[in-house]
Every structure is written in C-alpha cells, then in structure tokens.
C-alpha cells in the first residue's frame, strides 16, 4: 500500500527543479552559431538533464572541443560524424572539470586519433593531461577562448569565455534548466559573482539548453542560493530565541538543531531517507558556509546527531561620554 506523505511544495520545487519530465527536447547535434556546434553525450537522465553537452568551437578546419561526455559509443559516433561531414579536426580538448560525464570520452577520442592524447587540457590535470591556468588563452580560426577558474561545484572547475560572442561556457556551475549543486557553497557563490562580473550575455551550459540571458540566469542562481542560506539561518535564529531565557543565558550556546530538525522546520514532514538522499547535501553546504561566516556554530560529536546553533550577536556597548556631567 502506497504511503501518502504531506511533503512541502517548496522542497519538491527545489528537489525536482532539474529533473522535470517536461524538459525541452534537444537535437543530437546542433549548429548553435557560426562558431559553436553542440553534440549531446547520449546520457540523458535525472542528473544529466538531456545529456552532457559537448561543444566544437571555431570556424576553420581546426576546432576546440569542450568536454567529452560520459564515454558512451553513441557520442563518439556522433562527434566523428560531425568531424567528417564538416571536414574538420580537433586541435584542443578542454575539460571543464573532472566528473566522469565530462571526461569519460577522452579515451575513446584518443583511440580514434592517438595524436589527440597530447592535446588534452584540464585544471589539476590527471596523468597525461596538460594543465589549464586561470586566464589561459586557446585560439583557433574564428574563436578566442579564455579559461576562467570557477571552483565550488568541483575544486578544478573551469568556465571558458568565447570572446567573439561574449559568451560563456558555464560547465556545471550554471545549467540550462534547474539549479546545480556545489560541495563548497562558499567558493561556488564567489564563482557565480565572478561569472556575473564577466558581463557575458550568452551561456553555453554543460547540461540543458542555451542560456539566452546569462546575466538574468546568474542573478537567479545567486538569489536562490542566498535565500536558501538565509532560510537556514533564520530557522536557527528562531530556535535560539525560543530557548533563551533570562539575561543570564545570553551569549551561551542555547538551543541547537540536528540536520533533520532543520529540514523539517523548513520543509515540513519529510522522511529521513529523503532528507539524507536529497536534502542533506545542500543543507550541509549551507551550514558549513554559515560556519565559515561565523554566523553558525556546532557541537562536536556524532555528525548525525550534531546540533547546529545560531551564534549570538555580541551587543556593542554605548560609547563612553567624556567631559562634564550636568548635575541637578
């Protein structure tokens, strides 16, 4: 018998934002502009949307490839078909980050053309790969691509700025649909601000459709994360205020909530397994960021039972008055 749980709608909008069954269909291969061809990785799914986007960039006979998909045979067949039909070759392979749905096709490409093994670039490179430095330029006919270090989603994450189009290949930092995840939320939010400061108009994400208004999308991402973090802090502040007693307890570690208690305070009645599998990652990211910002503390001990609490603000003393005091 199915069990009906009174889930809060706000949670499901968050959890399902990138897994909507109504995602627009994307062609296996698409010419997006005179400089950019997109080839889907053939790996659609809840975590990959329509699949990993890989891009051939440039206008001449030699093109830059950004990301390589998950390593499925269908992707190799697709990209080889594009290369042959356009009579073009690959000059550089640029990897946005280390995740397997972006790097998995590298061995297949090298098997197809062994000379490509000398032209694979990634920040914090694996064996046989070459490093990418922040600001490094990769150029082919019709395309100047600048690497931009944007960690947070991963420690090595790079975006790539296509100067001729004022466009940004956003990797997994910003998706065409829904929201991304970030193990290091603090650095991720810094990266979003950095990306916004680049002033790019167009976004080519690693998953999902082209982002036609990148500034608005970045503003949405930044606002979304800030609201979620502030929501967690508000829950902990209310809990502290609830349990604080008389003046003698001010400044002490009063109250405190476990991860599950925080989740239920924000989203209502949610089963433990849903919290652990779907909600805990972001909650932990936000709590650690708030800890780094010295707005939240925690009690040491078992991580599952650990209590998190809002740090009390120190009251500032009024400035001391100098000079004579009038007497009655």
Swiss-Prot record:
Binding residue positions for Zn(2+) 2: 101-102
Cofactor note: Binds 2 Zn(2+) ions per subunit.
Signal peptide: none
Known cofactor(s): Zn(2+)
Enzyme Commission code(s) on record: 3.1.-.-
Domain of life: Eukaryota
Enzyme class at the top of the EC tree: hydrolase
Gene3D superfamilies: Ribonuclease Z/Hydroxyacylglutathione hydrolase-like, Winged helix-like DNA-binding domain superfamily/Winged helix DNA-binding domain
Keywords: Hydrolase, Metal-binding, Zinc
Biological process according to GO: secondary metabolite biosynthetic process
Gene Ontology molecular function: any one: metal ion binding
Residues that, per the record, bind Zn(2+) 1: 97, 99
Pathway terms, separated by semicolons: Secondary metabolite biosynthesis
Catalytic residues identified in the record: 101
Function according to Swiss-Prot or TrEMBL: Lactamase-like protein; part of the gene cluster that mediates the biosynthesis of neosartoricin, a prenylated anthracenone that exhibits T-cell antiproliferative activity, suggestive of a physiological role as an immunosuppressive agent. The non-reducing polyketide synthase nscA probably synthesizes and cyclizes the decaketide backbone. The hydrolase nscB then mediates the product release through hydrolysis followed by spontaneous decarboxylation. The prenyltransferase nscD catalyzes the addition of the dimethylallyl group to the aromatic C5.
Family note: Belongs to the metallo-beta-lactamase superfamily.
Name of this chain's protein: Lactamase-like protein nscB
Organism: Neosartorya fischeri (strain ATCC 1020 / DSM 3700 / CBS 544.65 / FGSC A1164 / JCM 1740 / NRRL 181 / WB 181)
Gene name in the database record: nscB
């Amino acid at each position: 018998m199915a069990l009906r749980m009174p889930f809060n709608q706000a949670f499901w909008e968050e959890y399902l934002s990138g897994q909507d069954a109504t995602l627009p269909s994307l062609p296996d291969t698409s010419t997006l502009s005179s400089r950019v061809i997109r080839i889907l990785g053939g790996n659609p799914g809840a975590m990959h949307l329509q699949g990993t986007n890989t891009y051939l960039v440039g206008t001449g006979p030699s093109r830059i490839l950004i990301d390589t998909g998950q390593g499925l045979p269908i992707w190799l067949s697709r990209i080889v078909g594009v290369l042959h039909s356009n009579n073009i070759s690959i000059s550089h392979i640029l990897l946005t980050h280390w995740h397997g749905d972006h790097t998995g096709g590298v061995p297949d490409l090298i098997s197809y053309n062994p000379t490509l093994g000398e032209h694979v670039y990634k920040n914090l490179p694996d064996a046989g790969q070459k490093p990418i430095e922040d600001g490094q330029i990769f150029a082919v006919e019709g395309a100047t691509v600048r690497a931009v270090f944007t960690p947070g989603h991963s420690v090595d994450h790079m975006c790539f700025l296509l100067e001729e189009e004022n466009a940004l290949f956003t990797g997994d930092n910003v998706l065409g649909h829904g929201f991304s995840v970030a193990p290091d939320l603090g650095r991720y939010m810094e990266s979003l601000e950095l990306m916004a400061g680049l002033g790019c108009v167009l976004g080519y994400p690693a998953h999902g459709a082209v982002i036609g208004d990148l500034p608005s999308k970045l503003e949405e991402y930044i606002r979304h994360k800030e609201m979620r973090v502030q929501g967690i802090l508000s829950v902990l502040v209310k809990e502290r205020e609830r349990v604080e007693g008389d003046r003698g307890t001010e400044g002490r570690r009063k109250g405190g909530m476990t991860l599950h208690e925080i989740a239920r305070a924000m989203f209502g009645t949610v089963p433990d397994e849903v919290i652990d599998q779907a909600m805990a990652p972001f909650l932990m990211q936000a709590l650690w960021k708030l800890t780094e910002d010295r707005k939240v503390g925690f009690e040491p001990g078992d991580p599952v039972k650990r209590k998190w609490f809002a740090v009390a603000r120190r009251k500032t003393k009024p400035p001391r008055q100098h000079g004579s005091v009038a007497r009655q």
